[in-house]
Amino acid sequence: MEFNYNIEGGNFSRAGTASSEVKKILKQLNVNPAVLKRIVVALYEAEVNVVAHAYEGTMQVSIDPTVITVVIIPDIDLAMQEGYSTASPEVREMGFGAGMGLPNMQKNCDKLTIESKVNEGTKVTMTTFF
């Protein structure tokens, strides 16, 4: 099963919409609740990163395994450090941009791969086995 979700940068009112839809699908497939929670946390973090840091992104989900593609921070090593954030003061005032997005994504999936090209974007692939 494959699904594509467009994510609009800066639109915090819709942040979490794609991850919520994926959660519903996985619940219908009777995915183990503990695994489901990990997947949804990782998806939500990826989605919020797009909203907070990019103009737009695409979440491509393939069930078994789950794969997600989004646009994120170009400096991957720095971005993986807990607490690092490029979020604007406005984003931080809304409660986002704590610098935990990528570390939380890594903790909540079985495999995380990040490919990035400056001025072109970043592809994040998360795989979780259930």
Q: What are the roles of these predicted feature ranges?
A:
Residues 1-41:
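Bergerat-fold GHKL ATPase/HATPase_c domain
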